[in-house]
Amino acid sequence: MALILDTGPLYASLDRSDADHAACRALIEAATEPLVIPAPVLVEVDYWIQQRLHPGALVALLDDIETGAYQVADLVGGDYQRVRDLCDRYADADIGFVDAAVLAIVERLDEPKLATLDRRHFGLLRPRHRESIELLPA
């Protein structure tokens, strides 16, 4: 098992001024399973780092990836069809590429939980690999 990280908790763990910093940092530091970042999440995190933090925060995150603190999960062939299906099915809910990609990776890796602050979208999405997924932090 692993803990999949969506954009919100990963970014909040880096930004000490973020309202969710303490909870997200604690969640990440307490994790005993591998921490997995879906590759599309890195693009969103980079955007928020460039907007709100010093670029050194991105370099530090990449260093952590390089040293194995985080694993990166790329999308693979069948994931793109699932992303397409999710974007189509939930079009009225403004489910975008990154959220759909995160769920596709959670499903492919058969994970029971997801670290996300996006309760609006992930509370709505229904995974196909289980009845529901646990959203953290609680």
Locations of regions flagged by a protein language model:
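Short, well-structured N-terminal submotif of metal-dependent ribonuclease cores
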Residues: M1-I37, Q50-L62, R128-S132
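Short, conserved active-site loop motifs that form the nucleotide-linked donor/cofactor pocket
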Residues: Y70-Q71, I133
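Alpha-helical structural signal
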Residues: A39, L58, D99-V102
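A general alpha-helix detector
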Residues: D6-L10, E44-V45, R82
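Alpha-helix/helix-capping structural signal
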Residues: G8-P9, P40, G78, R120
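Histidine- and aromatic-rich ligand-binding microenvironments
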Residues: L3-D6, I37-P38, I95-G96, D118, ...
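Active-site neighborhoods of divalent-metal-dependent phosphate/nucleic-acid chemistry enzymes
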Residues: V72-L117
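Acidic, PIN/NYN-like endoribonuclease modules and their adjacent C-terminal/linker elements
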Residues: L103, E107-A138
